[in-house]
């Protein structure tokens, strides 16, 4: 699937492994797991491929986050993203990663 980043700090974390923004600093273990999960997302044909990895806990979100989906980075953090279909390719999914959030805040 094609993965895009809505916020620049998410792309910087993926590419560089760090960000200069003090608000979005994460522990090195979180960043490495984030990169690993994004790479796994890129390897899948579509979001249904994420369901075969139980540890990711793929789910569609409800309530105020209606329309978004998420996969777990670890017990505390998750990647929130919006799913979309690419014109011409029905099996390819474009995931726009919107946030790396603390699941319990």
What role is predicted for each listed range?
Residues 41:
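Conserved phosphate-interacting/catalytic interface
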Residues 17-20, 44-48:
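Short secondary-structure junctions and interdomain/linker hinges
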């Amino acid at each position: 699937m094609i993965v895009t980043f809505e916020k620049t700090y998410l792309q910087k974390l993926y590419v560089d492994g760090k960000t200069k923004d003090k608000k979005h600093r994460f522990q090195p273990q979180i960043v490495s797991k984030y990169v690993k999960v994004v790479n796994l997302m890129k390897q899948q044909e579509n979001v249904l491929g994420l369901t075969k990895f139980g540890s990711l806990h793929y789910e569609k979100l409800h309530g105020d986050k209606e329309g978004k989906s998420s996969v777990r980075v670890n017990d505390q953090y998750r990647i929130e993203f919006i799913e979309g279909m690419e014109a011409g390719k029905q099996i390819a999914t474009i995931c726009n990663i919107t946030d790396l959030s603390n699941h319990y805040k």
